[in-house]
């Protein structure tokens, strides 16, 4: 028999409406769109039974006993679901709460709030398992982010606070003190390449006293501020030699060397991650030592914002040259020939009022949408992903839609071709999605370049020079989509391939306007070095020269086969690897019936004493003895050997080599007589007339324009031009002949340096 409640009907109705709310938020981590900040998400519980209160009547007090715990399963009006134990009108004990958006908490409850041990899961895949208190993450717990980052340690009010360990998805590791989700106090950070910092932190950055150690035995101990050395410090080499100095407000570090050397300076450069290789520094010291370079990066919330780079990688940031003074010491001075003033950037910045302004805005909206849409898709590629019909149209009305944001451009439609394949290619080429979007879709406008060729295509370059966007014809899109499976297989198989790196294929169609198809690809000449000469080389001679007078040729002029007056000497290993890779790439293009491609070559000329640019001789000698500096002569053999040894150090340390095939390659350019006769390219034309002038250079090169197949138009072009010139001298020839001629030409302009 049920006991009647000793309360009035009005009080019972009031108790039925009791709502227990503990409401905080936890960001659902979604790629690079939101920063991680662990907070609780909509913890909303509704009491399922009336809460009974006692009532006094005069001196009489009647109390209803607390009913025993009961297991319930109750759908709530808002679509949520609670399953678990109730006691006294509250969730109390063990229970599970499911939100309609996919969030879930399972664990212990106390008077309607998550308290004790439990687990909270988000739809994104992120989880927290550990202790709760009054509905918040508090105590000891483990958070696993959707990208694989893992934090184990102490929590206070939904935030990392106290001692904790965090393992990052990229292999880095931090253990130490946290405050409000940031490293704060004393801690140790270990990079995946073996670099390690132990010391003090403040608000997520290195600040205070600490020690930075490299795997090769070098170490720096001293004061830091905002991620860079500031104040007194000591640098010690692995051989025991060391110096002590002080970093002052003018960013000069004066130091005393302990092995007979007087003064020098430590070089620290900073950069933002969104500005690719854009560091700058000033070098005013008297001797050369390994440099410490700290790169700022826009890390995730709670992550450190600096990355450590050693010797060779740091050296490419600086634009100064070494000369020998009268005492036999090297000093850094500005190179008046190569670095007087800012480098001229090609192209016209697209600003409001430019005729391509709307097209640029549409392109940026589309790229941002495409990268974000497919970021959460995690699966292996299927054969259907390569299907040329695998394309998606999306409308972008100015007022916005359910899937697109409002914008200030015209109404347009956006087409994405094989998006999952190109996302995988970007990963393969180590292009970070955030960097990709920031470079193309950030606040900086694109620069428009007119086509240097006859295609009429337009090129758009990002302000950081990393990515190039080219408008293409429908036929070129068809060729790329047709060869996409073979292209994907080729670049996966050969890491050092020289063929163009493609990052995406898209199409824009404004309402009532024409379609514009374009391809996003890597910029071959993205470098801290100024490219002072560039050549587009096909191996043909008919019409292969620039129409500009000699006096008008500058750094932005693209020269052609008949303008080439250099032969490039490579160290034996690089020469053999180049010939092997050229053969592989040409065989791939020949199999795909591709012709009319070019080898684009960029040349940076170095003075004899600019070894600092490549991080060569100045950084090899560690003894600090004056005799070593005086005896080192920058012999070319030593340059190649040092480059190889330091590159091997980088590989063993887990970092990508600075020098790779087609990028940052040290070479010697030997001046030859200008080639005005195609016969000199033939098998009998190897006896070039040398001028005896040899230059130390840095080379960049790759195979471009690989989307032209040998179709009917090219066959007609071949027949027509054959009436006017030697058929072997024209560009439009059968792919098999083109490949053989191209390889033969490359083997003649690149020479093994004995």
UniProtKB/Swiss-Prot annotation:
Any GO BP: lateral root formation
MORN repeats: 82-104, 105-127, 128-150, 151-173, 174-196, 197-219, 220-242
PIPK domain mapped to chain residues: 351-750
Keyword Metal-binding: no
Regulation affecting activity: Activated by binding to RABE1D.
The enzyme's E.C. designation: 2.7.1.68
Domain of life where this protein originates: Eukaryota
InterPro entries per UniProt: MORN, PIno-4-P-5_kinase_pln, PInositol-4-P-4/5-kinase_C_sf, PInositol-4-P-4/5-kinase_core, PInositol-4-P-5-kinase_N, PInositol-4/5-P-5/4-kinase
GO CC entries: plasma membrane
UniProt keywords, alphabetically: ATP-binding, Cell membrane, Kinase, Membrane, Nucleotide-binding, Repeat, Transferase
CDD domains in alphabetical order: PIPKc_AtPIP5K_like (cd17302)
Catalytic activity as recorded in UniProt: a 1,2-diacyl-sn-glycero-3-phospho-(1D-myo-inositol 4-phosphate) + ATP = a 1,2-diacyl-sn-glycero-3-phospho-(1D-myo-inositol-4,5-bisphosphate) + ADP + H(+); a 1,2-diacyl-sn-glycero-3-phospho-(1D-myo-inositol-3-phosphate) + ATP = a 1,2-diacyl-sn-glycero-3-phospho-(1D-myo-inositol-3,5-bisphosphate) + ADP + H(+)
Pfam family, one: MORN
Main localization (coarse): membrane
Compartments, as annotated in UniProt: Cell membrane
Residue numbers spanned by region Activation loop: 710-731
One GO molecular-function entry: 1-phosphatidylinositol-3-phosphate 5-kinase activity
Residue ranges of the region described as Disordered: 54-77
Complex and partners: Interacts with RABE1A, TUFA, RABE1C, RABE1D and RABE1E.
Remarks, miscellaneous: Plants overexpressing PI5K2 exhibit severe dwarfism and are enriched in the plasma membrane of the root meristem.
Protein task: Possesses phosphatidylinositol (PtdIns) phosphate kinase activity. Phosphorylates PtdIns(4)P and PtdIns(3)P in vitro. Doesn't phosphorylate PtdIns(5)P nor PtdIns(3,4)P2 in vitro. Does not exhibit phosphatidylinositol kinase activity in vitro.
PANTHER family for this protein: PHOSPHATIDYLINOSITOL 4-PHOSPHATE 5-KINASE 2, PHOSPHATIDYLINOSITOL-4-PHOSPHATE 5-KINASE
Protein's recorded name: Phosphatidylinositol 4-phosphate 5-kinase 2
């Amino acid at each position: 028999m049920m006991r009647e409640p000793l309360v009035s009907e009005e009080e019972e109705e009031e108790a039925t409406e009791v709502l227990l709310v503990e409401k905080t938020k936890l960001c659902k981590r979604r790629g690079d769109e939101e920063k991680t900040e662990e907070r609780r998400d909509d913890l909303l519980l509704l009491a399922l039974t009336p809460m009974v209160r006692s009532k006094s009547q005069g001196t009489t007090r009647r109390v209803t006993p607390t009913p025993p715990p009961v297991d319930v399963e109750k759908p709530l009006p808002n679509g949520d679901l609670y399953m678990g134990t109730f006691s006294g009108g509250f969730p109390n004990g063990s229970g599970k709460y499911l939100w309609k958006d996919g969030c879930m908490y399972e664990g212990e409850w106390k008077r309607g709030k998550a308290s004790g041990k439990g687990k909270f899961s988000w739809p994104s895949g992120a989880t927290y398992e550990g202790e709760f208190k009054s509905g918040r993450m508090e105590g000891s717990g483990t958070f696993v982010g959707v990208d694989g980052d893992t934090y184990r340690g102490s929590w206070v009010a939904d935030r990392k606070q106290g001692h904790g360990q965090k393992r990052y998805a990229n292999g880095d590791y931090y253990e130490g003190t946290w405050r409000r989700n940031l490293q704060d106090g004393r801690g140790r950070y270990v990079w995946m390449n073996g670099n390690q910092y132990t010391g003090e932190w403040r608000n997520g950055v290195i600040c205070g006293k600490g020690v930075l150690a490299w795997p090769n035995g070098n170490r720096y101990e001293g004061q830091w501020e905002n991620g860079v050395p500031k104040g007194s410090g000591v640098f010690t080499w692995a051989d025991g030699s060391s110096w002590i100095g002080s970093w002052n407000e003018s960013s000069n570090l004066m130091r005393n060397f302990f092995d007979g050397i007087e003064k020098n300076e430590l070089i620290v450069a900073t950069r933002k991650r969104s500005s690719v290789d854009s560091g700058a520094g000033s070098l005013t010291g008297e001797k050369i030592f390994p440099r410490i370079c700290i790169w700022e990066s826009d890390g995730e919330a709670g992550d450190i914002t600096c990355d450590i780079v050693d010797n060779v990688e740091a050296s490419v940031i600086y634009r100064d040259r070494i000369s020998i003074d009268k005492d036999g010491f090297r000093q850094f001075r500005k190179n008046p020939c190569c670095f007087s003033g800012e480098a001229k950037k090609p192209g016209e910045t697209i600003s409001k009022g430019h005729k391509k302004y709307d097209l640029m805005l549409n392109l940026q909206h589309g790229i941002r949408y495409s990268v974000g849409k497919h970021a959460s898709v995690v699966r292996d590629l299927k054969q259907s992903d390569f299907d040329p019909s695998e394309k998606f149209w999306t409308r972008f009305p100015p007022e916005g839609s359910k899937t697109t944001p409002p914008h200030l451009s015209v109404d347009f439609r956006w087409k994405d071709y094989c998006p999952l394949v190109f996302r995988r290619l970007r990963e393969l080429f180590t292009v970070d999605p955030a960097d990709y979007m920031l470079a193309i879709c950030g606040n900086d406008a694109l620069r428009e370049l007119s086509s240097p060729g006859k295609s009429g295509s337009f090129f758009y370059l990002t302000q950081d020079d990393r990515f190039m966007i080219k408008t293409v014809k429908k036929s070129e899109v068809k060729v790329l989509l047709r060869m996409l499976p073979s292209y994907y297989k080729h670049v996966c198989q050969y890491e050092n391939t020289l063929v163009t790196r493609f990052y995406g294929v898209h199409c824009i169609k404004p309402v009532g306007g024409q379609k514009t198809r374009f391809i996003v690809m890597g910029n071959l000449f993205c470098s801290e070095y100024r490219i002072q000469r560039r050549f587009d080389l096909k191996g043909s001679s008919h019409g292969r020269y620039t129409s500009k007078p000699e006096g008008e040729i500058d750094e932005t002029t693209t020269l052609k086969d008949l303008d080439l007056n250099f032969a490039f000497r490579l160290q034996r290993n690089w020469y053999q690897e180049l010939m092997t890779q050229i053969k592989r790439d040409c065989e791939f293009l020949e199999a795909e019936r591709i012709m009319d491609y070019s080898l684009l070559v960029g040349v940076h000329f170095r003075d004899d004493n600019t070894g600092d640019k490549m991080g060569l001789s100045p950084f090899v000698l560690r003894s600090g003895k004056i005799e070593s500096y005086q005896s080192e002569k920058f012999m070319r053999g030593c340059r190649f050997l040092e480059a190889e040894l330091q590159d091997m150090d980088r590989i063993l340390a887990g970092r990508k080599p600075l020098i790779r095939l087609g990028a940052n390659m040290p070479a010697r350019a030997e001046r030859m007589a200008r080639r005005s006769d195609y016969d000199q390219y033939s098998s009998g034309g190897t006896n070039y007339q040398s001028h005896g002038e040899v230059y130390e250079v840095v080379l960049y090169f790759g195979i471009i324009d690989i989307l032209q197949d040998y179709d009917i138009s090219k066959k007609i072009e071949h027949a027509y031009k054959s009436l006017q010139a030697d058929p072997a001298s024209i560009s439009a020839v059968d792919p098999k002949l083109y490949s053989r001629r191209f390889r033969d030409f490359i083997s003649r302009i690149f020479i093994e340096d004995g």
